[in-house]
């Protein structure tokens, strides 16, 4: 039976698509789950993820509240992906996120799950034509920011008949930054939706009525990690606190962390001061081009940058490694952002410390409370990071894998295993962490070499 472009898929197939995901046997699901967790390098799910899985096995409405960094993405994505219909060639699951970074992060998680289902992320900051080219071959899972997804739906860019599940990830953040009308439109334009999942890392959030939840199951894990976080204050004799910041970084030594500022101008001033002291760092703020923000996060994840200087854009919804600390160079104006910033460290079961830089004549807001004082020890400046980042001009669309990139560096490049760091594979390129000391001998051996059928350039980022 042929499909009419105007009328959508035939009713028989739509009915099958609505039923088939829920006919999957438990034994098959468990087997697939074990394979996925193995690919992700995860031994077992944490209590929050297990609870989410149990709720989604019997309920169509879930509100999942859990701190940043506790694995919410896998908590909802794993059971939803295991329920996808392998026979359906249209979009089945839509995930709405407040930021480009979170869209890219979730897309990467799903690719690493190795399910065989196609996934695409769409977001502002890149051409709509690129989106249309990518989703012409339909993904099973579409991830995107509210504005971009709403735009594609209004244009009727794809069939919505098979979209039965919508996730509003960090929904309160999307509302906070002004996406309510787009979110309303998305839900209105997806009439087939049966399962709705909302996630947040904020306590006391209000569920918007337009989502249309009837009897949601609420999982609240927001109190689970308070004991893992230490918050301390560091007094500063001067109002600009720059000298105190450098003393604190020297005191902390070679650890990784985020320094939060409230304003882009302050970030520039602090960045200049850190550069004067040869303290390597990346910058992450809303005023930057998307490609620059992505590269800053890549270099932070692979250790090229031990520090990230950021606005509250980095307080949630970005993929960063385990952090030893965060520093409030400026305190946020609201308690919620204070909590989200602190949530970047002491994630899962790890320890972490949030430091508040306080000018001695400055009164701390009530939401901070009484804090113990951290006494700074005199120490030399931290040594520069031993890592650098290389750009490889070939990626997933060229059928290149992480193993191919590693093989190039080990075989042709004669690189020692301990000198190769994190490899991040993108659609059309790859980024590789490499020990700086090995670069001079490595680069001439690996650039202009073939990976699969493509000759790639390898350059220093």
What are these regions (language model features)?
Residues 228-273:
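Conserved interdomain hinge at the start of the Helicase C-terminal
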Residues 89-151, 162, 280-283:
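Conserved nucleic-acid-binding Ia/Ib motif block in the N-terminal RecA-like helicase ATPase lobe
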Residues 54-58, 74-88, 111:
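Walker A/P-loop NTP-binding motif
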Residues 159-222:
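Post-DEXD/H (motif II) to motif III coupling segment of the RecA-like Helicase ATP-binding lobe
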Residues 344-370:
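Conserved segment of the helicase C-terminal RecA-like domain
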Residues 23-65:
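Conserved pre-motif I regulatory segment
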Residues 318-330, 353-355:
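A short beta-strand element within the Helicase C-terminal
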Residues 132, 280-282, 288-310:
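Conserved helicase ATPase core of P-loop NTP-dependent helicases/translocases
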